[in-house]
Amino acid sequence: MDRAPQRHHRTSRELLAAKKTHTSQIEVIPCKICGDKSSGIHYGVITCEGCKGFFRRSQQCNVAYSCTRQQNCPIDRTSRNRCQHCRLQKCLALGMSRDAVKFGRMSKKQRDSLHAEVQKQLQQQQQQEQVAKTPPAGSRGADTLTYTLGLSDGQLPLGASPDLPEASACPPGLLRASGSGPPYSNTLAKTEVQGASCHLEYSPERGKAEGRDSIYSTDGQLTLGRCGLRFEETRHPELGEPEQGPDSHCIPSFCSAPEVPYASLTDIEYLVQNVCKSFRETCQLRLEDLLRQRTNLFSREEVTSYQRKSMWEMWERCAHHLTEAIQYVVEFAKRLSGFMELCQNDQIILLTAGAMEVVLVRMCRAYNANNHTVFFEGKYGGVELFRALGCSELISSIFDFSHFLSALCFSEDEIALYTALVLINANRPGLQEKRRVEHLQYNLELAFHHHLCKTHRQGLLAKLPPKGKLRSLCSQHVEKLQIFQHLHPIVVQAAFPPLYKELFSTDVESPEGLSK
């Protein structure tokens, strides 16, 4: 009598296993909407988690989107957030529908077509794996985040993304290992623009003796010290006292460079162009679109609707938005000349430690200092919009930081170069080839100074916030996540994006460990 239940139980397990296999096979097909890595069939179409969530929110909120251009905006992984109207129209055109959640059995023709597409994608992946380079031996200890950061075969392919222009090759002068190439030159870069002269000088012997100095200047002017440019520390009372230590400022010492070969002015100018181009290609929203939307504010009723949402729903929404922003930062890093030449361990260390900091800096582009609002899900809203998160102090601190940065009147190129230096930081713990990171960081410092010198904006250096402020905001975010994770562990495990959990989530602590 027990045979029938056993047979039924075995059949159920086989069906479940077959369903999982079928789903995993479908996931090799990219999202039909934006081309990102898909996670299965959602609302009747193979899509990624981002497009699934976007379609769900558009149906729940019943929002009427509008297009500011010709209603034919390209929708791919990098541009999908630029026009919500065209993204929704593409979802509908490809067949996404709430009625398609349970669409019944596929016809044989549909199954055969799906199977053929799966096989095609698998063959392409096998070909890519055959031509892919073997990762450096020093990178094997960093495999845990390789998939979710997209530095292998995960969400963002190792090579150039299919929907973004390929990053151009890096000049050899920016990447040579120490001990190779031409000898040092005392004059590292010299530029004369519109009557202004900026002479950057470096002596390796002096550099060894001097040690690393701060690069901030009280008057913001480039001044020659004993070993080149020197800047004194600047304090910002409105942001709190900067922390002391080897990692206390946004940009490390400019004066004492690592022992690296000569980098020509041509190389430095190329690096400026590369960083700025990489930034433009990996911005979620164009600046002109953000400025155009500034008058599009959430109504009082819409703000109230957000405030009435459950804490877990708002956390899930923000986790998905933050993860998407971090994916753009990953693409930015991969396009920076020299980054992909670092060992994989160091790539992951830099991204893990710096991606959130870059997102916080980038946020100033979407912040309107006139009314203290930020662009979120299609409109501008203030701190009250995020009340349901239950972390008003953190949200206020992030808004204050964006307000401080917006007062600096960053140009797009200045944000690009600044965020590159926030990301490429040789003081991150765990680096295996620190000298190579120092080399890249030093050249980025040169590039930043060179650009500021050309645009007569050297005074900006004295106004940059202390690095301790960025670290403090990131630490507050992790602390609030730990509290939320303790209250809603299942939500974090089941609904939060894998990349977000890899970067920020920890084991659930006891209530005693979550003191205010």
Swiss-Prot record:
It is found in: Nucleus. Disruption phenotype: Mice show decreased adipocytes size and highly insulin sensitivity, leading to an improved control of circulating fatty acids. Mutants are protected from hyperglycemia and insulin resistance in the state of obesity. Loss of circadian pattern of some clock genes expression in the peripheral tissues and massive apoptosis of thymocytes. Knockout mice for isoform 2 lack all lymph nodes and Peyer's patches, as well as LTi cells. They also show a reduction of T(H)17 cells in the lamina propria by at least 10-fold to less than 1% of the T(H) cells. Coiled coil: none annotated. It comes from the Eukaryota. SUPFAM superfamilies: Glucocorticoid receptor-like (DNA-binding domain), Nuclear receptor ligand-binding domain. One of its GO terms (molecular function) is sequence-specific DNA binding. PROSITE patterns: NR_LBD (PS51843), NUCLEAR_REC_DBD_1 (PS00031), NUCLEAR_REC_DBD_2 (PS51030). Residues 267-506 form the NR LBD domain. Induction: Isoform 1 expression oscillates diurnally in peripheral tissues such as liver, brown adipose tissue (BAT), kidney and small intestines. Isoform 2 is induced upon antigen receptor ligation in the presence of IL6 and TGB1 (via STAT3). Induced by TGFB1 in T-cells. GO terms for biological process: adipose tissue development; alpha-beta T cell differentiation; cell differentiation; circadian regulation of gene expression; lymph node development; mucosa-associated lymphoid tissue development; negative regulation of thymocyte apoptotic process; Peyer's patch development. Its main location: nucleus. Changing residue 500 to F: Abolishes interaction with NCOA1 and NCOA2. Keywords: Activator, Biological rhythms, Developmental protein, DNA-binding, Metal-binding, Nucleus, Receptor, Transcription, Transcription regulation, Zinc, Zinc-finger. Pfam families: Hormone_recep, zf-C4. One of its GO terms (cellular component) is nucleus. A motif (AF-2) lies at residues 499-504. Transmembrane segments: none annotated. The keyword Zinc-finger applies. Residues 109-118 have a biased composition (Basic and acidic residues). Residues 1-30 are annotated as: Modulating. Residues 119-133 have a biased composition (Low complexity). Belongs to the nuclear hormone receptor family. NR1 subfamily. Interacts (via AF-2 motif) with the coactivators NCOA1, NCOA2 and PPARGC1A (via LXXLL motif). Interacts with the corepressor NCOR1. Interacts with CRY1. Interacts (via AF-2 motif) with PROX1. Interacts with FOXP3. Interacts with NR0B2. Nuclear receptor that binds DNA as a monomer to ROR response elements (RORE) containing a single core motif half-site 5'-AGGTCA-3' preceded by a short A-T-rich sequence. Key regulator of cellular differentiation, immunity, peripheral circadian rhythm as well as lipid, steroid, xenobiotics and glucose metabolism. Considered to have intrinsic transcriptional activity, have some natural ligands like oxysterols that act as agonists (25-hydroxycholesterol) or inverse agonists (7-oxygenated sterols), enhancing or repressing the transcriptional activity, respectively. The AF-2 (activation function-2) motif is required for recruiting coregulators containing LXXLL motifs such as NCOA1 and NCOA2. This is Nuclear receptor ROR-gamma. It comes from Mus musculus (Mouse). The gene is Rorc.
